[in-house]
Amino acid sequence: MSAYLSNPRVWQESWDRQQEAFLHDREERFAAMLEAVAATTEGGAPKVLDLAGGTGTISLRVLARFPGARVTVLDQDPVLMAIAEASLRERGTVVDADLGDPGWRAKLPEDGFDAVLTATALHWLPAERVAALYGEIREVLRPGGIFANADHMPEESLPTLSEKLRDHGRAEREARYASGAATSWSDWWARAAADEFLAPRAAERERIYPGTRHHQEWTPPALWHVDALRVAGFSEAGVLWRGGTDAAVVGLR
């Protein structure tokens, strides 16, 4: 039997471990985002859009913090969406949509979200698309709703330190790979492609994403994102959390 079908939770947990090799403070950014959701939502049952949500990492943490929450995961990756569907089951909705297409909102089952949350995802989009996307995100939020984006956002006033932090993190990560303490990005995907259930989805993923797609990262400083959120019409925007070369920015509709 497929390792996926026998225990889909294994894949969810292995994704978390693989991501934590890149982001040692991954849970801290999630906690900061959820605290902001709690502060801006009445009733303790927020309606949350997990944007570019992959395996549903954020959604699972939303449900753990707010058991009555309604979550929607939006992504385009067939492998990650399959894991999200198995992990959430009847507790959430998974939507297949491309954020590079301005028509992504038409695929949502509803709008008026209390929160739209995303992490370590939008750096794959070009600057002009991110700026436009912020305006589109604002439109699916209820008045007073919150948007949070946690990603690679180096401090522009610390270029030397930022470079050293990146190099240090890379060296630590490679050491963990070499010792077997962590699974690398490429190894994780190779394992998924070898799984009986996920293999067809991995093949579909290769058709959707050209081989060079994930080589083009765009990581401006947090202030760029804050300015873009203000231009997009958010009433307030700023930095919620920072850890090394990463940050979480938020905007209030």
Predicted regions located by residue number:
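Class I SAM-dependent methyltransferase SAM/SAH-binding core
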Residues: 49, 56-104
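Short catalytic micro-motifs in class I SAM-dependent methyltransferases
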Residues: 120-124
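A short glycine-rich, Lys/Arg-flanked "PGG" loop and its adjoining helix->strand segment in the class I
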Residues: 131-143
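A conserved beta-strand element that flanks and buttresses the S-adenosyl-L-methionine
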Residues: 117
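Short alpha-helix
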Residues: 217-232
